[in-house]
């Protein structure tokens, strides 16, 4: 019988080393395979993410123009669509005399107007049409009206009323809002004949202040002059030369102010006359009575914390009745005099409207007509009382509101 050769201890060690080497090779190969598989998986994953990111980016950056406008954009566009047909451009001419001849030129101070009746009444700023020898009105559809008359002016508010001869044409008047209810921060839209060249330019912004007094330099159709206005609405909606007389609108498309002035020493500040200040005179004009402005006959200063401290009143807001220079606080024979108002009274309400918060005495009285009876809530010697006043008609040259 053949016998297998016996392995020596050295041979056994060599065999074990060979087996271990094979095992290590297998492990190394497996590790390499695992690394390859993981790398491929990561590559596929990253490609997928990149592809999804590209799709997302393409979804967000639309080039087909189908993205819906925001609610804010839609609101401004809706107001513009609704109101633009009721806003007109005004172009004036004047006759200037020289030592040699009389020349006629077109004024550079073109303006804007608001249609306030179906039969052709327009409201604008007085300085836009003052001393004009002829006036042309251009509607938003391009229709030109050359037969235009100034039918009334309210110089205290820089307001003028025009009448167009429209024949059988029915115009679309703008709806008037309530300027006593406007709030700081409220969104507004302005429309006007910007720079006298760009008809129905639309801008938007917010009400940035209320009750602002402004001394404005206006050129209009004559030499530059200064006009002092009170209780104006301040806005950051862009209002440019040529926008004077145009509407300041709320988001419902209602007129809450008539644009009148721009702060030349600051950007983003414009002013508008509260619409309530012209409602009374508008009623009289539409009734064919011309401008009849309601009159109280009291001189006052609007209270601030500093003024209240100076005059020694406990009232926080309102109109403090006081003398103005050498002029008495109450105009003799005026409605205020007949109703028994006194110096140092504080007018806190006119009917239900709060003086100060909702306007000053001038603009709040402007909503009424001569002959109207209003209830004034006053603070006298620390006690509140109500007096009834029958307003009279303002006569040019009278002072006091």
Report residues per predicted region:
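Acidic- and glycine-rich mobile interface elements
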Residues: 170, 319-329, 348-351
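Surface-exposed loop/turn motifs at beta-strand-loop junctions within extracellular Ig-like
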Residues: 380-382
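Conserved PDZ fold ligand-binding element
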Residues: 122-123, 333-359
């Amino acid at each position: 019988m053949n016998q297998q050769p016996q392995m020596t201890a050295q041979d056994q060690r060599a065999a074990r080393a060979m087996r271990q080497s094979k095992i290590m090779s297998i492990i190394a190969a497996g590790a390499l395979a695992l690394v390859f598989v993981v790398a491929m998986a990561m590559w596929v994953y990253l490609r997928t993410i990149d592809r999804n990111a590209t799709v997302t980016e393409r979804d967000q950056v639309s080039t087909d123009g189908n993205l819906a406008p925001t609610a804010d954009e839609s609101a401004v566009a809706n107001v513009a669509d609704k109101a633009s047909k009721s806003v007109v451009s005004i172009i004036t001419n004047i006759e200037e005399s020289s030592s040699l001849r009389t020349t006629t030129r077109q004024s550079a101070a073109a303006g804007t107007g608001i249609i306030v009746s179906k039969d052709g009444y327009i409201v604008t700023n007085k300085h836009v049409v003052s001393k004009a020898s002829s006036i042309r009105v251009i509607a938003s559809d391009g229709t030109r009206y050359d037969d235009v008359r100034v039918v009334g002016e309210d110089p205290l508010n820089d307001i003028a009323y025009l009448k167009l001869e429209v024949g059988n044409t029915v115009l679309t008047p703008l709806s008037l809002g309530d300027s006593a209810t406007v709030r700081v921060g409220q969104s507004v839209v302005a429309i006007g004949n910007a720079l006298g060249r760009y008809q129905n330019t639309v801008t938007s912004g917010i009400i940035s202040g209320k009750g602002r007094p402004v001394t404005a330099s206006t050129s209009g159709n004559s030499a530059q002059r200064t006009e002092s206005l009170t209780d104006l609405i301040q806005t950051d909606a862009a209002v440019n030369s040529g926008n004077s007389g145009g509407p300041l609108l709320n988001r419902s498309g209602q007129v809450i102010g008539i644009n009148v002035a721009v702060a030349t020493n600051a950007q983003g500040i414009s002013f508008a006359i509260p619409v309530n200040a012209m409602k009374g005179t508008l009623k009289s004009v539409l009734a064919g009575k011309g401008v009849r402005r309601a009159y109280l006959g009291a001189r006052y200063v609007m209270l601030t914390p500093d003024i209240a401290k100076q005059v020694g009143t406990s009232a926080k807001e309102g109109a403090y009745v006081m003398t103005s220079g050498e002029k008495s606080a109450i105009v003799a024979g005026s409605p205020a005099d007949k109703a028994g108002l006194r110096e140092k009274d504080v007018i806190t309400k006119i009917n239900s409207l709060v003086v100060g918060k909702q306007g000053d005495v001038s603009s709040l009285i402007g909503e009424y007509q001569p002959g109207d009876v209003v209830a004034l809530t006053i603070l006298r010697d620390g006690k509140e009382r109500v007096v009834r006043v029958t307003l009279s008609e303002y006569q040019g040259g009278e002072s006091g509101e």
